[in-house]
């Protein structure tokens, strides 16, 4: 079975969904921009040699509908002979795109895959047009479709206090801001056209969503967002709403060698699991455990972790379940996470994987694990090994 290696990994800046930098930029354009950029950065690869494009996107309607992967590839002027498919595993969509592209290479159905994902939550809100089947109420609690209430459930089950959630949110913003100031995101962010507050076209090369002024006093003043009577989860301890795209170029190790391209890492293992929809945020725990088992590794072998911060309560419950609370400041989300950067649903899986790869290189770490919770009760994880 072929080893699958990561050649390149990039993303757009994260734009604020409400009146932000990408308010006049379409999701297809964000995607096409990254596709073109990946190809221009790797001229050794002829675009016609891409076997397939896998692109994550959750709300596949309006500008994100009718197979946005293909629409974006056509906008990027990738040869018509290269196919493209849109992948939807909700929050884990672009990580699933990575898994699908990698698996095709592993079994010999492909040599090169371009993968990524996008979500423009300013143009297509998360709940746009959603109509749950009423019969689901027989087996699944209605609140399981309300992500904030699933976070409240985890907070209660795992005794996650309001104070610890607020502290985690402050940490996310502080770390993301520090990473920005130190240019630690520079290697992964591709400057992207947007509009400033006055509507003037400009190129953005920084994440617009980070709030460096976030502090415990300000967060403590916020009301619970989902359970107004007994809740502890607030807007400040939930992932920000943002717009963005991410992309990765992956190929077989043998193809990379023949093209003279230097791999950054290889995929050591992949895993997807299901869990109770009412505690969907706990999915990263069994997903990570399965990925470790498939990789033949132990938790202590992993030098760095990227956990998508859907909610502080959800993140802390997972870290507690994995036994990572004590090592969090040394190993987990060292550049902040979705509470500060936002969680453009279809983009996030490849985004956290890209951030993880850069951290692994900067800190000379051999193994890294990226994992995410998924709405309606799933978890997904990928273990990367530097080569």
Curated annotation (Swiss-Prot):
Pathway recorded for this protein: Lipid metabolism; fatty acid beta-oxidation
Top class in the EC scheme: transferase
EC number(s) stated in the UniProt entry for this protein: 2.3.1.16
GO cellular component: cytoplasm
Pfam family membership, one: Thiolase_C
Catalytic activity: an acyl-CoA + acetyl-CoA = a 3-oxoacyl-CoA + CoA
GO biological process: fatty acid beta-oxidation; phenylacetate catabolic process
Compartment list: Cytoplasm
Catalytic residues, chain numbering: 91 (acyl-thioester intermediate), 343 (proton acceptor), 373 (proton acceptor)
Keywords: Acyltransferase, Cytoplasm, Fatty acid metabolism, Lipid degradation, Lipid metabolism, Transferase
Coiled coil: none
GO molecular function list: acetyl-CoA C-acyltransferase activity
Family listed: Belongs to the thiolase-like superfamily. Thiolase family.
Function: Catalyzes the final step of fatty acid oxidation in which acetyl-CoA is released and the CoA ester of a fatty acid two carbons shorter is formed.
HAMAP family: FadA (MF_01620)
Subunit annotation: Heterotetramer of two alpha chains (FadB) and two beta chains (FadA).
Name of the protein in question: 3-ketoacyl-CoA thiolase
Source organism (scientific name): Yersinia enterocolitica serotype O:8 / biotype 1B (strain NCTC 13174 / 8081)
Species lineage: Bacteria, Pseudomonadati, Pseudomonadota, Gammaproteobacteria, Enterobacterales
């Amino acid at each position: 079975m072929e080893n699958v290696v990561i050649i390149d990994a990039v993303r757009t800046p994260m734009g604020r969904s409400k009146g932000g930098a990408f308010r006049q930029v379409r999701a297809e354009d964000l995607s096409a921009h990254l596709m073109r950029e990946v190809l221009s950065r790797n001229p050794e690869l002829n675009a016609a040699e891409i076997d397939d494009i896998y692109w994550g996107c959750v709300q596949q309607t309006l500008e994100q509908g009718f197979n946005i992967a293909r629409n974006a590839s056509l906008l990027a002027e990738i040869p018509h002979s290269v196919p493209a498919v849109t992948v939807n595993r909700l929050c884990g969509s672009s990580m699933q795109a990575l898994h699908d592209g990698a698996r095709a290479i592993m079994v010999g159905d492909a040599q090169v895959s371009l993968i990524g994902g996008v979500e423009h939550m300013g143009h297509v809100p998360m709940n746009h047009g959603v109509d749950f089947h009423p019969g689901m109420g027989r087996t699944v609690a209605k609140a399981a479709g309300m992500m904030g209430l699933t976070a409240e459930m985890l907070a209660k089950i795992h005794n996650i206090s309001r104070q610890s959630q607020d502290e985690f949110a402050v940490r996310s913003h502080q770390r993301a801001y520090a990473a920005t100031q130190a240019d630690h995101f520079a290697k992964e962010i591709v400057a992207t056209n947007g509009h400033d507050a006055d509507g003037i076209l400009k190129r953005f090369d920084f994440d617009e969503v980070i709030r460096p002024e976030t502090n415990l006093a300000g967060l403590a003043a916020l009301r619970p967002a989902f359970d107004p009577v007994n809740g502890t989860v607030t807007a400040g301890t939930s992932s920000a709403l943002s717009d963005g795209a991410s992309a990765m170029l992956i190929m077989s190790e043998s193809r990379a060698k023949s093209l003279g391209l230097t791999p950054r890492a290889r995929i050591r293992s992949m895993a997807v699991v299901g869990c109770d929809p009412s505690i969907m945020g706990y999915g990263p725990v069994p997903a990570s455990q399965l990925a470790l088992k498939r990789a033949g590794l132990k938790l202590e072998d992993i030098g760095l972790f990227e956990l998508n911060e859907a909610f502080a309560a959800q993140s802390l419950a997972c870290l507690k379940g994995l036994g990572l609370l004590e090592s969090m400041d040394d190993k987990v989300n060292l550049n902040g996470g979705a509470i500060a950067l936002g969680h453009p649903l279809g983009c996030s899986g490849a985004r956290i994987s890209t951030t993880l790869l850069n951290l692994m290189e900067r800190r000379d770490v051999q193994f890294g694990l990226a994992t995410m919770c998924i709405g309606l009760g799933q978890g997904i994880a990928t273990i990367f090994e530097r080569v």
